[in-house]
Amino acid sequence: MAKPLEITDAMYQSEVIDADKPVLVDFWAPWCGPCRTVGPILEEIASEQEQNIKIVKLNVDENQQIAGQLRVFNIPTMILYKDGQPVDKIVGAMRKQDLLNRLSQNVDTISTASV
């Protein structure tokens, strides 16, 4: 059962840009209430969709370089990468079904059926 991978600025290139499947990056912080709401949703999606998408988490308090480069000013922010390029940016918390629907717009293999 896949879980979101905690990454650092140093891991960003190898885990996100060079990944062999789409990657959803969750920019978060431990003190952020909406981030704590999104966390379990991302864990479910990571487990249910592990063949289709990789989910990683970047703590912006501990890793400010990438967040700054990508102009992440609000959290939670999620950026979807496909073939090493950002294709969607989601700011704020979202219900699981809404997030799956949004991801499926860019990742054909994402199942939006309720599980």
Mark where each language-model region is.
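N-terminal targeting signals for export/organelle localization
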Residues: 1-4, 108-115
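Conserved Rossmann-like nucleotide-binding pocket used by diverse enzymes
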Residues: 3, 8, 28, 54-56
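A short beta-strand-turn-helix
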Residues: 4-22, 64
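Short pre-active-site segment immediately N-terminal to redox-active cysteine/selenocysteine motifs
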Residues: 20-21, 27-31, 74
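Conserved helix-turn-beta segment immediately C-terminal to the redox Cys motif
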Residues: 21-22, 39-58
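Conserved redox-active cysteine motifs that mediate thiol-disulfide chemistry
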Residues: 27-41
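Structural microenvironment flanking redox-active thiols in thiol-disulfide oxidoreductases
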Residues: 60-67
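Non-catalytic, surface beta->alpha helical segment in thiol-disulfide oxidoreductase systems
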Residues: 74, 80-112
